[in-house]
Amino acid sequence: MLDKPATRPQMTRWQLAKFVLGRSFYLMVALLFIESALTAATTYLIIKAGRDVANDDFLTTDLIWILLAQGGAYAVGAVSWIFAERAGFGAFGRYMQRFARDNRHETKLLHEKGTREVVEPFLTGETFHIFFQLVYELEADLKLFFHLILNIAVIGSEIDTSFPVAYGIIFVVLIGLQMLARKPVARANLENQRMTNRMTAQGYTAWDNVFAGNRYNLRLWLAGFKVRLRDALRAQIKAIRTRETVSTVSGIFALIVIFIVMVKVSIQNAGDTEVLVMLATVLPRQIEMTKDCYTLAAGWNDMVAVWARLGGAVDNMYPDPDAAYDARIKYDRLVLREDEQAKTVGSLDDALKLVYGKRTGRINVRGGNGSGKSTMLAALKASIKNRAYYWPTTDRLAFQFALGTELVDDDEGIDPELLAEAGEPEQHEAVKKVGFSSGERQLKSLQEIVRFTDASIYLLDEWDANLDPKNRAAANALVEKLASRARVIEISHRDAA
């Protein structure tokens, strides 16, 4: 007996997030640390210059060293972006490879429109943006963390040890605040993602409803779109409000604490000109660091948002097929015709026995509309897996003959102002490429299947649907060629009575 469908094991968020790890990511982290170390060196040189001024020993070389250190930090930071991009693209590539590998045998999901509407946005861009948001947030947060830690160490050792203590208190309080706010922020961001995906999914039916020219259908489509648009806007505003409230409170708290410490140090060293001058020279850096604390808090909230969005990608990594999928097949309305014999089956097991009964030959699946012919072919593929080649009724499968024939506008969606700044015209002439009619695609696809595939079983769904009599005869000869070397189970109009 066939196993009953069970819930598939799910990937964790940590497993998905680890796709960004690799040589590029580690090099990015190393460069960020070097950049922060050079920035901390600049802080030290500024303090040293202030001390020299207080002691009437200031030299022009102090400025040169500051220039070299800070300039080096800028250069290293620029290089780190290259590896950040490589890490993001590598993560998305690994995600697509894993999705393809782990879902290639779930043929029962091919025609599940509801599941496809939910999962497809993650394949067409959502997960790509999630990975890059993750990489960018990690880059920004690590840069801030290294920057704060190293600069705090310099200021604490050169001016006053109260500053490291103050920043330590700030970190503890901010982490506690973020932990308290984590669930509300995550819930708001997850709802925002769901509503946004729901809104963008509506766009997949825009073309049909607009260009069909029917006022009735267009009115219904626009009404549905407006509802989803309003829901997405409300969810977006709620997510931003929740996130920014926590971040603002964190930033103000950090600013108050650091300025209290600065005032305290100034009072304690009122007669020490050297300390006061050094404190004054790092005042801009101190203000910058309080801003960094606020930004780091906001970055933590953004990381929570990315973590929530990772949950959406994880939830849709392994979609479950309908547990009652096989029940859609109306076996009492199906006839499996081989040669001159017509046979009936009562279950998918019976159909598999008939398929495995011979190594070659053709079985034509007959039945009325809604009897489950295509459903049975998909169920057979899900059971037979790699030994079967399945050709469904879709023209979206990748074939060699079609590579490079699609009319793709590389400038689609690009801001015209960006094209103008680059010195390129806003409208490009479409490159004329060879196109194929549905019948031509059908025949060429079948020719490629015969030539380049070597399965023991072929499942062909409506292979002659778009063919004229001449091309149907040519296609039938190709199917016969397949049947001479393998088992062919087909849905076709061949010899239809």
Predicted segments, located by residue:
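GG-anchored amphipathic helix commonly corresponding to the ABC/SMC/Rad50 NBD signature/C-loop
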Residues: 378-383, 438-458
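An intracellular "coupling" helix at the cytosolic face of ABC transporter transmembrane type-1 domains
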Residues: 18-23, 125-135, 214-259
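Cytosolic ends of transmembrane helices, especially the final helix of ABC transmembrane type-1 domains
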Residues: 274-277, 281-322
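A hydrophobic transmembrane-helix motif
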Residues: 37-47, 139-182, 237-290
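Short cytosolic helices in intracellular loops of multi-pass membrane proteins
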Residues: 91-109, 115-120, 190-230, 306-313
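Transmembrane helix-loop-helix hairpins at lipid-water interfaces of multipass membrane proteins
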Residues: 25-76, 155-165
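Juxtamembrane loop-to-helix connectors within ABC transporter transmembrane domains
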Residues: 104-151
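Membrane-integrated ABC transporters
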Residues: 1-39, 84, 129, 145, ...
